[in-house]
C-alpha cells in the first residue's frame, strides 16, 4: 500500500495513480524529487506556455508563472493557455485557469511583477528557474544569482523557425541506467562471437555521474581568437551567432523582431550581425543574409519542440535522472533538426 504524502516526500495513492506511467519510466525516487520541487517560469508567451504545460503534467510541487506584460493580439497564435478575448490582460493571469486545470495536484501561482525588480532573496524559494523573453543582462544577472545559491538555471527563446535552450546546473550529479555487460561462460562454443562480451538487455545497473556547467556569461563570451577556438569555429553551429544577434536586437530595441516592422527590423538585424561578428573577429559570411527571413515572431510548432526539450531538461535536472544537455541546445525549424553544443571555457 502506498503511504499518504508526508513531509519526508512520500507519494499518496492519488499521486501514484496520476503519475503511474512516469514512475514506471524514471522510478519512484525520481518522481519524489520532482514532487518536492518548485520552479519559477518567467515569460508566458508561446514557449512559456509549452514549458508550463509540460512541467505541470510532469508533476512538480509548485510552478510560479511570472510575467509583467499584457496579452497582445499576436500572442494567441502560439500561446494556447490564453482564452479568446484576453487581449489587454496580464499574460500570466490570463494563463492561470487553463494551466491549473491541467493538473490540480500542482500548486500553480502567478506573479505580475517585473523580473528586473526582484531581489536575490526572491529566487531562493525555488529549486529551478527558467527564463524566456528576457534581455541578455537579465539572463546573466539571474544566472549569477542562481549559481551563487545552487539553484538550477535554464533559459530559452523562440525566434521564428529558430529556438535555443541553455542550462547552468553548476556541479550536477545524476544517475544513468546502463545495460550490464555479461561475459560468456567458458566452454561455451556457439560461434566466433562467444569470446566477446555481450550486452544483456534484461539486466541494467544505475551509474552515478557528475558534470560541471559554466555560467551563461562565459558561454556567450567565447574568445574565438585562439588557434584552438578557430578550429572549433568550423564545428560550431551558426545558430549560436544568430542568438548573439537576436539578443543584441532585444537589448537595443527592447523587443524582438516584429513582422509589423519587417523592413526596418531586417535592416537593423543585418547591421547588428555585422557589428557582432566583427567584434568577435569572425566573418559576417558565417551568418548568411537570408537569416532575417526566418527569425520573426514565435511559431507554434517550434515552441512545441523547444518547449518540450527545455521542460524535459528541467525534469531531468530536478529528478537527477539521465545526462543533461551541457549546455546549449539549438533547433533549426527549416532543417527540422537540433544540436547540443557545449560552449564556454575549456
UniProtKB/Swiss-Prot annotation:
Q: Could you tell me what this protein is called?
A: SUMO-activating enzyme subunit 1
Chief subcellular location equals nucleus
Q: Which family does it belong to?
A: Belongs to the ubiquitin-activating E1 family.
Q: Which Pfam families does the annotation name?
A: ThiF (PF00899)
Record key words, sorted: Acetylation, Ligase, Nucleus, Phosphoprotein, Ubl conjugation pathway
Its GO CC terms are: cytoplasm; nucleoplasm; nucleus; SUMO activating enzyme complex
Quaternary form?
Answer: Heterodimer of SAE1 and UBA2/SAE2. The heterodimer corresponds to the two domains that are encoded on a single polypeptide chain in ubiquitin-activating enzyme E1. Interacts with UBE2I.
User: Which pathway is it part of?
Assistant: Protein modification; protein sumoylation
Localization of this protein: Nucleus
Expression sites (tissue/organ): Expression level increases during S phase and drops in G2 phase (at protein level).
**Gene Ontology process terms (BP):** positive regulation of protein sumoylation; positive regulation of protein targeting to mitochondrion; protein sumoylation
PTM-bearing positions, type N-acetylvaline: 2
GO molecular function terms here? ATP-dependent protein binding; enzyme activator activity; protein heterodimerization activity; small protein activating enzyme binding; ubiquitin activating enzyme activity
| Function description | The heterodimer acts as an E1 ligase for SUMO1, SUMO2, SUMO3, and probably SUMO4. It mediates ATP-dependent activation of SUMO proteins followed by formation of a thioester bond between a SUMO protein and a conserved active site cysteine residue on UBA2/SAE2.
Residues recorded with modification Phosphoserine = 12
Classification via SUPFAM superfamilies? Activating enzymes of the ubiquitin-like proteins
Q: Sites of the modification N6-acetyllysine? A: 198
- Residue numbers carrying N-acetylmethionine: 1
